[in-house]
Amino acid sequence: MAQTDKPTCIPPELPKMLKEFAKAAIRAQPQDLIQWGADYFEALSRGETPPVREQSERVALCNWAELTPEVLKILHSQVAGRLIVHAEELAQMWKVVNLPADLFNSVMNVGRFTEEIEWLKFLALACSALGVTITKTLKIVCEVLSCDHNGGLPRIPFSTFQFLYTYIAEVDGEISASHVSRMLNYIEQEVIGPDGLITVNDFTQNPRVWLE
């Protein structure tokens, strides 16, 4: 008699594989996510590098607008300082600026967002499609959120940077919480001035700050 109640064995490496797939999907922004996913895992099974389409190729193949910091600034201005945005409203904003629906869905899936979305978290993951590395992602987020409108270096409150760095590192899964804590403590104690702001150069040009 065949057994039907055998326990399902989940490989320990599966969560990491799925996380890497989700991040790769955000960066590739494929038109057909299902086919792209099939090609991705087929390449992995053969021990090959998974497919990643170049941005120029993506633009040439579709009529969608290109995701840029400027487009994200438009979305941020429409959010108008709110911490929470409803998924339906954000999807409509995304559609109005003509960004790919698959990219929106990928960000939603990676962030495990539901009906009510924390805007800063969504923005951080959208920026990761452009930034590739954590440092570059945070640089783009700072440019989008910058409170300096006089042509100076992009800068944001350190508390906001702390929240974003902690969240992005958590989603990435490759950086220990202790490393994140050490970097934040160093920046807060040795870099941040009395205004409580952090500039892009504070974490991109300082040799003692290594966010990855």
From Swiss-Prot:
GO terms for biological process: cilium organization; flagellated sperm motility; protein localization to cilium; regulation of protein phosphorylation; sperm capacitation. GO terms for cellular component: cytoplasm; motile cilium. The modification Phosphoserine is found at S56. Sumoylated, sumoylation decreases upon spermatozoa capacitation conditions. Keywords: Cell projection, Cilium, Flagellum, Phosphoprotein, Ubl conjugation. Belongs to the ropporin family. This is Ropporin-1. It comes from Macaca fascicularis (Crab-eating macaque).
